[in-house]
Structures are given as structure tokens and as C-alpha cells.
């Protein structure tokens, strides 16, 4: 039995956005189930006692968006540098966890494009309601949904993740948008 691809991401991660635009085709090409796994990247960094948002380090930040613009152009993915980075993604991630498995992929794409293409504030309730619906946003304050995000982040920690995007196939971890070719080769039995 073939393991599914588990795609761990946070909406705040621009590299996860780029990966989200390619992962479905990669999974389909390899006849693998794709499981979307939203989690809180800041919570992961905190649990690992890692510096928050490595991309924001003063010596790295000037290069970050140049790199992203190049990558997006190279892969033909729409991308605009947002006016605010990072944005808080707790509420949007909770909204995603309140959706069904079937609703999740399209909602992820809507939220990513709103942030990384349209420069919309996905942490704003009105914007979020427009993207995923009032009912979904209302659920973000429920104890069950809050607990689900904590559990999703704990799972990322417990399974050895250290950043996003991360891909797990069984126990094989592939970290980063730039490792998707290696993930593809692994799924084809070449690695």
C-alpha cells in the first residue's frame, strides 16, 4: 500500500504558497492521495526553541522577496510582495481546520492567493468571511477548533518537522519547496 503525501503548511509561509500551487499535480502524477495539513509555524518554532521567522532576520529579509519573485516567475505562479509580512494566520488556519476534507484544497488556494497575490489581510474577519464564509469564521472561536490547531501543531513537532512547507510520505520527510523534485523522485522509486 502506498503512503499518501502529507503536506504540512502555514499560510504565512510564502514557500508553502508556491508548493501549494504544484503539490496537487505532483500527487496526481504519482497516483498518491494528498492530505492537506495546516499547522501554526510560529507554534512549531516556539516548541523547538528556534528563532521566529528565519526569513525576517535582518541579513536575510532583503533577499527573501527577491528570491520569491524569481521562483514564482520561474514556475509561472502568480505572486506579489504583500504590504505586510508576516500576517497573523491563527484565525485563517482555524477556519481551514473547520472545513471538510473536500472543501479544504480550494479554500487553501483562495486564502493563499488572497494573501500572496491580491495583498488582502486574511487575518481580518470580514476578508476571511468573504473567502471561506461567515459560518466557517464563526467556528474559529470554538474550543474544538482551537484545540484542533494546537493538536495539528503538536503533530508537526512530534513528527520531526522544523519548518514549512514539509512533506511526509510515511516517515520520509522532505522539507522545503525546493525539495519537491526529490519528493517526486522518491515517489517514483528513484531515491
Feature map (PLM): residue ranges:
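C-terminal cap of thioredoxin/glutaredoxin-like
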Residues: 3-6, 16-32, 106, 110-191
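Structural alpha/beta surface segment adjacent to cysteine/selenocysteine redox centers
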Residues: 11, 15-115
Amino acid at each position: 500500500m502506498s503512503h499518501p503525501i502529507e503536506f504540512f503548511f502555514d499560510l504565512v509561509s510564502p514557500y508553502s504558497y508556491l508548493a501549494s500551487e504544484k503539490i496537487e499535480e505532483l500527487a496526481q502524477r504519482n497516483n498518491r492521495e494528498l492530505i492537506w495539513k495546516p499547522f501554526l509555524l510560529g507554534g512549531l518554532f516556539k516548541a523547538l526553541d528556534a528563532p521566529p521567522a528565519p526569513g525576517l532576520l535582518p541579513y536575510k529579509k532583503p533577499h527573501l522577496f527577491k528570491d520569491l519573485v524569481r521562483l514564482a516567475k520561474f514556475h509561472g505562479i502568480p505572486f506579489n510582495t504583500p504590504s505586510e509580512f508576516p500576517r497573523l494566520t491563527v484565525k485563517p488556519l482555524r477556519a481551514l481546520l473547520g472545513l471538510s476534507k473536500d472543501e479544504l484544497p480550494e479554500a487553501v488556494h483562495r486564502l493563499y492567493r488572497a494573501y500572496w497575490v491580491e495583498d488582502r489581510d486574511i487575518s481580518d474577519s470580514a476578508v476571511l468571511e468573504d473567502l471561506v464564509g461567515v459560518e466557517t469564521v464563526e467556528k474559529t472561536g470554538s474550543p474544538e477548533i482551537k484545540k484542533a490547531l494546537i493538536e495539528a501543531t503538536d503533530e508537526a513537532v512530534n513528527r520531526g518537522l522544523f519548518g514549512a512547507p514539509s512533506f511526509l510520505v510515511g516517515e520520509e520527510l522532505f522539507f522545503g519547496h525546493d525539495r519537491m523534485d526529490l519528493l517526486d523522485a522518491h515517489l517514483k522509486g528513484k531515491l
